[in-house]
């Protein structure tokens, strides 16, 4: 009787699907898809979610493949629920650079981000931002692996946190916590450095930050130092890749390389 009741409740919660299945008989709607996504999914079955960034007043659908005018989920990120790091590539219309490129604008801006899958909503708070090269040639054949979806080992997590703090344009009071924090990487274009990407970093269920101090020695890709005729103080640290767990029991590990991205 209890099982039957649960089944009945579950069926009633998704009763709206009957209408859409009748209207779109050739569409295979995922089990559990929310009603607010059904019409969009019927027209574009590569839809995997939605992103809303209050700080730049952007809201748009997320697709599983890149297309002009839409956000896209990284190929290594799960569409079902947040990974340790979920990466979303934004269209040009989402001007996150203007909202989060300085400590002053960051503090004044709404730092909230709502990342929605077809099944649930997840709230993030931006904690920092940085520039990364789009082409490996602009940083000695290297691209910082910010979009690592698999869980890192504790030591790799510490190294990753250090890598981020050096790259952040400013540092808030937030300290990343291993085995607790999940991150979102919002990757947009840059009008300041057209050859680079601008990346805003958010933490799941994080609180708005009220303090931020400009980083006086930002780690940029090598091309920035070349263009500005400066010596790169971080030149000996280029080439870091994380060690991640390769099994669900977290007993086996693997060191990633450029081929994994």
Language-model segments: what does each one mean?
Residues 2-261:
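Solvent-exposed, non-transmembrane regions of membrane-associated and secreted proteins
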């Amino acid at each position: 009787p209890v099982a039957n009741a649960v089944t009945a409740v579950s069926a009633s919660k998704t009763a709206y699907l009957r209408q859409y299945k009748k209207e779109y008989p050739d569409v295979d709607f995922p089990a559990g898809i929310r009603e607010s996504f059904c019409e969009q999914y019927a027209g574009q079955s590569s839809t995997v979610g939605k992103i809303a960034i209050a700080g730049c007043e952007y809201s748009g659908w997320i697709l599983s493949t890149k297309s002009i005018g839409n956000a896209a989920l990284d190929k290594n990120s799960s569409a079902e629920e947040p990974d340790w790091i979920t990466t979303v590539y934004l269209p040009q219309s989402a001007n996150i650079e203007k909202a989060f490129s300085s400590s002053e604008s960051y503090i004044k801006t709404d730092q909230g981000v709502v990342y929605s899958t077809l099944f649930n909503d997840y709230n993030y708070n931006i904690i920092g931002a940085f520039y990364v090269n789009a082409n490996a040639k602009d940083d000695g054949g290297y691209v910082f692996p910010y979009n690592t979806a698999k869980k890192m080992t504790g030591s790799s997590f510490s190294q990753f946190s250090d890598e981020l703090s050096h790259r952040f344009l400013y540092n808030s009071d937030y300290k990343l916590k291993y085995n607790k924090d999940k991150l979102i990487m919002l990757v947009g274009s840059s009008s300041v450095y057209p050859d680079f990407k601008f990346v805003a970093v958010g933490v799941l269920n994080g609180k708005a930050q009220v303090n931020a101090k400009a980083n006086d020695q930002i780690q940029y890709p090598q091309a920035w130092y070349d263009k500005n005729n400066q010596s790169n103080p971080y030149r000996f640290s280029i080439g870091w890749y994380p060690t991640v767990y390769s099994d669900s029991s977290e007993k086996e590990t693997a060191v990633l390389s450029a081929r994994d991205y």
